[in-house]
Amino acid sequence: MTELTTPIYPLQRNWSWWFLNDDRNASWQDRLKKVYTFNTVPEFWAFYEAILPPSGLNDLCDYNVFRDDIQPKWEAPENWDGGRWLIIINKGKTPEVLDAVWLEILLALIGEQFGKDMESICGLVCNVRGQGSKISVWTKNCNDDDTNMRIGVVLKEKLMAAASKAHSKPLFDVIHYQTHRNCVKKTTSALKYKFSLKSIV
């Protein structure tokens, strides 16, 4: 009798999940920990279903899912010349919207749905904040406008499709692209964006 085995469904690369806790008395470096590395679909779902969704995290916590060889830090060599596509989830949105946006982009990322531009993507970040949470896709080269715009278009398409299936309204109003160096040097809450894509034109 042949024993049935669970399909492995390997991913094309290793991904690491990092968690930033909300300990206000600790340094940022001490708060950030790598908690899991996965490279198959079953490994991903086993971990994902065992943890809290973003909406269940405390204020000031972050989830980061990055290629295993890249740390989720601006100063990392792979990130310093890069930027991010930023989605702001206003506090008026329901918790389900935050979780839906996070999962939709996460599945697109580990499923290699950005095609040849996957090599330009470093990882995905969710910053849980009381005044409005942020989800961002980090890219390697902020000056590669064509690649970054293609990534943004795929993001928009994925989120618009997800909204049409399960939500009566778009999951986002606008997504922006900004450079990491601009974020690091910011002196006000107003940041310059290189590109913006609206959910409804």
UniProtKB/Swiss-Prot annotation:
Keywords: Disulfide bond, Initiation factor, Protein biosynthesis, RNA-binding, Translation regulation. PROSITE patterns: IF4E. Changing residue 65 to L: High selectivity for monomethyl cap structures. Increased selectivity. Disulfide bonds join 122-126. GO terms for molecular function: RNA 7-methylguanosine cap binding; RNA trimethylguanosine cap binding; translation initiation factor activity. The keyword RNA-binding applies. Changing residue 122 to S: Unfolded protein. It comes from the Eukaryota. GO terms for cellular component: eukaryotic translation initiation factor 4F complex. The keyword Manganese does not apply. Gene3D superfamilies: RNA Cap, Translation Initiation Factor Eif4e (3.30.760.10). Enriched in the germline. One of its GO terms (biological process) is regulation of translation. Belongs to the eukaryotic initiation factor 4E family. eIF4F is a multi-subunit complex, the composition of which varies with external and internal environmental conditions. It is composed of at least eIF4A, eIF4E and eIF4G. eIF4E is also known to interact with other partners. Recognizes and binds the 7-methylguanosine-containing mRNA cap during an early step in the initiation of protein synthesis and facilitates ribosome binding by inducing the unwinding of the mRNAs secondary structures. All 5 eIF4E proteins bind monomethyl cap structures. Only ife-1, ife-2 and ife-5 bind trimethyl cap structures which result from trans-splicing. Translation of trimethyl cap structure mRNAs may be regulated by intracellular redox state; disulfide bonds change the width and depth of the cap-binding cavity determining selectivity to mRNA caps. This is Eukaryotic translation initiation factor 4E-5. It comes from Caenorhabditis elegans. The gene is ife-5.
